[in-house]
Regions:
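Active-site C-terminal subdomain of aminotransferase-like
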Residues: 1-99, 105-108
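Conserved PLP cofactor-binding pocket of PLP-dependent enzymes
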Residues: 118-142
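Short, well-ordered loop/turn and helix-capping segments at boundaries between secondary-structure elements
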Residues: 28, 48-51, 95, 118, ...
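PLP-dependent enzyme catalytic core of the Aspartate aminotransferase-like
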Residues: 63, 99-101, 135-172
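Helical (often loop-to-helix) elements that flank the catalytic cores of nucleotide-handling enzymes
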Residues: 100-120, 152-154
Length: 172
């Protein structure tokens, strides 16, 4: 009976010590309570998202993305999924556009990202479906329209942006 009590005491003591170590490792580093500034910022974001202005802005973001995508396609660029229904456009720069003189195939996503950045257009290198290249130097680039729409750009502006992208990549 004494041996069993010692084991129970030893186990209980070990479990208590282990619990303290786990609690110390998790809180406050990994867990914590909500912060008032975070709660307030979520409240403001939800309020703004419910306004007519934000709904109009969101619609304009998608319109701009569609114009960007359509203009790239008209220039022979291979847009993944042949268009967009969101704020993003995914472009294959490795295989490029093969249906027109604007073809710029053979650029990696990393090269295209740098070329466009050097010309004042910020995009992200991005893998594309069935990409055979590394995620660090993929075949595609991802274009978004939210930032420029926030600055007041419209469909006409995005048509010009698309043409500029094609010219930059074609002349690389």
């Amino acid at each position: 009976m004494i041996e069993i009590s010692c084991i129970r005491i030893f186990c209980a003591d070990t479990i208590r010590k282990l619990n303290k170590k786990i609690d110390k490792a998790i809180f406050p580093g990994l867990l914590g309570g909500p912060h008032n500034n975070q709660i307030a910022s979520v409240a403001v974001a939800l309020y703004e998202a419910n306004t007519k202005e934000f709904k109009d802005y969101s619609k304009q973001v998608v319109k701009n993305a569609k114009v960007l995508s359509d203009t790239l396609i008209k220039n022979g660029v291979r847009v993944i999924s042949k268009g967009t229904d969101s704020h993003l456009v995914l472009v294959d720069v490795w295989n490029g556009g093969t249906k027109s003189k604007n073809s710029f195939g053979g650029l990696s996503g990393k090269q295209a990202e740098k070329l466009l950045e050097d010309n004042g257009i910020i995009v992200n290198k991005n893998t594309i479906p069935f990409d055979t290249r590394s995620a660090f130097d993929p075949s595609g680039i991802r274009l978004g329209t939210a930032a420029e729409t926030t600055l007041g750009k419209n469909e006409k502006d995005f048509e010009q942006i698309a043409n500029r992208i094609v010219n930059i990549l074609k002349n690389a």
